[in-house]
Every structure is written in structure tokens, then in C-alpha cells.
Amino acid sequence: MEGFFWKTLLVVGALAIAGTSSLPHKPLIYEEAVDLAVSIYNSKSGEDSLYRLLEAVSPPKWDPLSESNQELNFTMKETVCLVAEERSLEECDFQEDGVVMGCTGYYFFGESPPVVVLTCKPVGEEGEQKQEEGNEEEKEVEEEEQEEDEKDQPRRVKRFKKFFRKLKKSVKKRAKEFFKKPRVIGVSIPF
């Protein structure tokens, strides 16, 4: 009978130890997650300047113990410090006309090791594009007026000039779009 008691106690103890689950990652509060995301951006983006957190609003759904996906939303601004200097972000002031980046990130805690994916793009980009388009339209009007002044040129020359202006405008627009694509960074996090 005494042997049965010890065997039962041993089995119950083994089940109790095996039954306790530990998280595959350490609990991560929202502020730590955002700080980690900014640090990852600074180390992996290829930018010359460091970026520092400007604003982050904790979502109501953030669960530091969750094993599911978690979402981040924050903005950061370019600082006067260069990446090559390897200085602490607390020492770096914001650039007066520094770029403000709007970022969305996802932590995938279900992966082993956990993975974070960040997508950042300049804030106010759409407003700048509209302003640039307005400026380009003004330039076109000026160019058309200039063409009218050059009435003594053959019609063929005018058509070629107009065609090449449109081509130049299209190339500039596509080049700007290409270089303003959002930066996407994905890394695994060793916890």
C-alpha cells in the first residue's frame, strides 16, 4: 500500500510539472514592443540617421501574455544622430525638418523564435504629392504659354517638345514613386 502511495504521488507530481505551460516568449508590454520595433528599424532600415519614437498609442487589445499576433501603430521622427555613431536615442534630438515616419508592425508570437514585421512610410506623403502635382500643372501652363510665344517654330518641333515634356514628367513621377515606397522589415526576435 505504501508503494502505491509513492507511485501515485510521483505520477501526480510528474503530471503537475508537465501540465504547467510556460510561454515561448517573455511577456512584452506595449511600450517595450514599440521600443524594440524602433530599435529594429534603426538597425535594419539602411537609413543614415537614427529615428526616435514620436508617438505611440497602446491598443486596447494588447495582451503581453498572448501567443497570437499583436499589432503596433506608432510614429517616429528622424534625429540629428547618425546610425554610424551608435549613440543612445535619449542623447539624440529631433531634426528640425526631419522626416516623420508612420509605422505599422506585427509581432508573431506563435512562431519560434517570435517574428516582427514593420512597415514604415513617410507621413504626409499624399499631401506632398498633391502639392507637387499642382506645381507641375502650373509649370505646364507656363510651358504652354511659352509654346504660344514660339509660334514661328514648325508644328513638328512643337509636337516633339510636347511629347518629350510629357515623357520627362512621367519618368520623374515614376522615379519619385519608386523611391517613396514604404520600407518593410522583418526579423526574428531571440527571447
Swiss-Prot record:
<comment type="similarity">
    <text>Belongs to the cathelicidin family.</text>
</comment>
<dbReference type="GO" id="GO:0045087">
    <property type="term" value="P:innate immune response"/>
</dbReference>
<keyword id="KW-0044">Antibiotic</keyword>
<dbReference type="InterPro" id="IPR001894">
    <property type="entry name" value="Cathelicidin-like"/>
</dbReference>
<keyword id="KW-1052">Target cell membrane</keyword>
<dbReference type="Pfam" id="PF00666">
    <property type="entry name" value="Cathelicidins"/>
</dbReference>
<dbReference type="GO" id="GO:0005615">
    <property type="term" value="C:extracellular space"/>
</dbReference>
<keyword id="KW-1015">Disulfide bond</keyword>
<protein>
    <recommendedName>
        <fullName>Cathelicidin-related antimicrobial peptide Bf-CRAMP</fullName>
    </recommendedName>
</protein>
<keyword id="KW-0964">Secreted</keyword>
<dbReference type="GO" id="GO:0044218">
    <property type="term" value="C:other organism cell membrane"/>
</dbReference>
<feature type="disulfide bond">
    <location>
        <begin position="103"/>
        <end position="120"/>
    </location>
</feature>
<dbReference type="GO" id="GO:0016020">
    <property type="term" value="C:membrane"/>
</dbReference>
<keyword id="KW-1053">Target membrane</keyword>
<feature type="signal peptide">
    <location>
        <begin position="1"/>
        <end position="22"/>
    </location>
</feature>
<keyword id="KW-0165">Cleavage on pair of basic residues</keyword>
<comment type="function">
    <text>Potent antimicrobial peptide against most of Gram-negative bacteria, some Gram-positive bacteria (Bacillus) and some fungi (C.albicans, P.pastoris, A.terreus, A.nidulans, and C.globosum). Adopts an amphipathic alpha helical conformation, that may allow to partition into the target membrane. No hemolytic and cytotoxic activities have been observed on mammalian cells.</text>
</comment>
<keyword id="KW-0732">Signal</keyword>
<keyword id="KW-0472">Membrane</keyword>
<keyword id="KW-0929">Antimicrobial</keyword>
<feature type="region of interest" description="Disordered">
    <location>
        <begin position="126"/>
        <end position="154"/>
    </location>
</feature>
<feature type="disulfide bond">
    <location>
        <begin position="81"/>
        <end position="92"/>
    </location>
</feature>
<feature type="propeptide">
    <location>
        <begin position="23"/>
        <end position="161"/>
    </location>
</feature>
<dbReference type="InterPro" id="IPR046350">
    <property type="entry name" value="Cystatin_sf"/>
</dbReference>
<feature type="compositionally biased region" description="Acidic residues">
    <location>
        <begin position="134"/>
        <end position="151"/>
    </location>
</feature>
<dbReference type="GO" id="GO:0042742">
    <property type="term" value="P:defense response to bacterium"/>
</dbReference>
<dbReference type="GO" id="GO:0050832">
    <property type="term" value="P:defense response to fungus"/>
</dbReference>
<dbReference type="GO" id="GO:0031640">
    <property type="term" value="P:killing of cells of another organism"/>
</dbReference>
<keyword id="KW-0295">Fungicide</keyword>
